[in-house]
Amino acid sequence: MFLLDVFCVPLLGAGTSGKPRSSDMDIVTYDDVHVNFTWEEWALLDPSQKDLYRDVMLETYRNLAAIGYYWKGHNISEGHFQNSRRNGRHERSDTEEKLSEFTQYDKDFAYQSHPQRHERIYSGEKPYEGVQYFEDFAHHSSLQIQRRTHVVEKPYECNQCGKAFAYHSYLQRHERSHTGEKPYECNQCGKAFGRHSHLQRHERIHTGEKSYDCNQCGKTFVHHSHLQIHKRTHIGEKPFECNQCGKAFARNSHLLIHKRIHTGEKPYECKQCGKAFAYQSGLLYHKRRYTVEKLYECNQCGKAFACHNSLQVHKRTHTGEKPYKCNQCGKAFGRYSSLQRHERIHTGEKPYECKQCGKAFGRHSSLQRHERIHTGQKPDECSQCCKDCGCYNSLQIHKRPHTGEKYFECNQCGKGFSQNCYLEIHKRAHTVEKHY
């Protein structure tokens, strides 16, 4: 049976074949209106189809109850889903929870308030015909439910945000997003959820259950969605593309992180020094200067680092090694990030855009300097001569003549200079002397 058959299931007297039964002319049974799947059929449905099936059946029972049918002593929740439990399906959505309100009714229900309409079940009279699938229904309310499925009618509207839903149970579930109600609580850690299915997924964290296996590498996952994301590593699928630079990602979360390059957003701030970072990894790396001993020391200048990788990058400043070469102009760089910035000169990419005037820049530091035009801020102004140096590094270099610091020393005569460019100019004097 396909899910389509469920949508078109007759709500009254399915299985009577238009013929009256001798002993129970005034009875329609529970089995007449509910539909069971075999395990093979159920396995073909995805979770959203299963949820939709349950909601359609729930809506069927509600409409029957509303027009005068009733049950006695028949637990619909157990009866309707008994096959699913028997076949090992342990998931149970909040839609199923809603069926509990019908659990104290009889399997057989009698029609009380509309005997004429009830007689149509056995006479075969079906005055309303469904246009799309030619399904006949015994009364107009049944036809309306069928039509709602075909045209996706959404009569249940949220009075807070106006969002509409095809089923009342969907509306009730949605309303929890406004009220903050979380009726499903984990009995191990106390965390609460708005949906029963979300609680079930959460409980797997405690049980360690990993039901979803990758058929290529055997890796297991707690959630089906995690398995789907993992599979992209095998097929190379990257469905999430940046609309500014075109770079694609396998996960939406990775795309959101990438977009910070364009927006300049830095949500991770160091509580000790106030420095902000676009990535959490950058903040964690930065924190090591406060919490971790710097074990890796440069044997040439004595500078120490928390990570061995940082030491290796630093050593290139002494050796002059530049392993990252631009394949367009051949210029080489000591850091990969420097190569990436350089390549924007060739591509013309300017990912950093000013939110106030729309001007774009190839470097984030250039955007920051530009934004000061709008704000009037001068954070890199020299406190002694009031010169605006534009960036922090330039300010530190500028301050050296004021403080008398001379970091760059000539190895021939010992003379010191505040800037490396001055040292290079000075060295030419020694070179000229050697020629004479």
Swiss-Prot record:
Q: Tell me which GO cellular component terms the UniProt record holds.
A: nucleus
Domain of life the protein comes from:
Eukaryota
User: Which GO molecular function annotations are given, in alphabetical order?
Assistant: DNA binding; zinc ion binding
One Pfam family from the record: KRAB
What is one process in the GO biological process aspect for this record?
A: regulation of DNA-templated transcription
Q: What does this protein do?
A: May be involved in transcriptional regulation.
Zinc finger residue extent: C2H2-type: 156-178, 184-206, 212-234, 240-262, 268-290, 296-318, 324-346, 352-374, 380-402, 408-430
Q: Locate the KRAB domain: which residues?
A: 28-115
Full protein name = Zinc finger protein 120
Name the lineage.
Eukaryota, Metazoa, Chordata, Craniata, Vertebrata
Where mainly found? Answer: nucleus
What the entry lists under PANTHER family is as follows: EXPRESSED SEQUENCE AW146154-RELATED, ZINC FINGER PROTEIN
Against CDD domains, the record matches this protein to: KRAB_A-box
- Gene3D superfamilies on file: 6.10.140.140, Classic Zinc Finger
Gene designation per UniProt: Zfp120
Q: Which of UniProt's keywords are assigned here?
A: DNA-binding, Metal-binding, Nucleus, Repeat, Transcription, Transcription regulation, Zinc, Zinc-finger
User: Which species does this protein come from?
Assistant: Mus musculus (Mouse)
InterPro entries under this entry? KRAB (IPR001909), KRAB_dom_sf (IPR036051), Znf_C2H2_sf (IPR036236), Znf_C2H2_type (IPR013087)
**Which family would the database say this protein is a member of?**
Belongs to the krueppel C2H2-type zinc-finger protein family.
Tissue-by-tissue expression: Widely expressed with highest levels in kidney, brain, and liver, and the lowest levels in spleen.
Query: Where, subcellularly, is it found?
Result: Nucleus
